[in-house]
């Protein structure tokens, strides 16, 4: 999806080559919704796999409604040979979950502190997602990168630390709860940015939303969000904040600020690059602090 113009022609390419399935990140599916399908025959397309980042529920439902194609959410990392879990093609599909572990892929959720596995989590308890099995790589080429990447359980089994937070439900399905490093910690209260992003994506004018923590002298950090709007939209940032305030389930998670930006910073594979958004928030807070103190400086 890095080729310029590919997205604009993707419907045609899928129809021409009679594609049975495709795999992409959520931002690709969100963008496809704004590209007319025209007369392309997509009856060949049976399944669309999605991973790499949480799929906003509104985008999920709208894509299936518009295309009639079933979306299957899954999970994987390069270190785990791309896919480790997936919602079943035939069987119960749980929207919002990353499905069931694939055959031979071992996934576990555990409490990890200082690169030490404290204990495995109970059903429904959130912890760090660990993986092992023949699909998991043995280690990085540069041994220094292995520091903190592995934990060992009481039986001497070695697990790769994904850095993602997750939980198992009663049926054995996995549910992501964000990246450990993406959690917004407001005065000791952990806030999952996904709960903010999903509510903002319910607004008809919002294409993409990303929530991050901005520095705060009192609480350490507070939630804010960046959004990309549909072409021609005139909705204001304050109107979006009011919209979120009425829908975000936790009062502490309501974003204190929303900024409208022309496009999201992306990684090479199409994932929203949150470190850049956090940098933008830090730069703005620093500028405002310096200006309030009457200090002339450039950030």
Predicted segments with their positions:
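AMP-binding/adenylate-forming catalytic core of the ANL superfamily
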Residues: 22, 133, 138-139, 157, ...
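AMP-binding/adenylate-forming
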Residues: 1-31, 47, 72
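Conserved AMP-binding/adenylate-forming
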Residues: 15, 46-51, 55-72, 79-174, ...
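Glycine-centered tight turns that cap/initiate beta-strands
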Residues: 44, 68, 104, 205-208, ...
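Conserved helix-loop-beta element of the AMP-binding
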Residues: 20-24, 37-58
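Short acidic/polar active-site loop segments enriched in Thr and Asp
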Residues: 20, 46, 69, 207, ...
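Short hydrophobic/charged patches on amphipathic alpha-helices used for structural packing
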Residues: 7-11, 39, 197
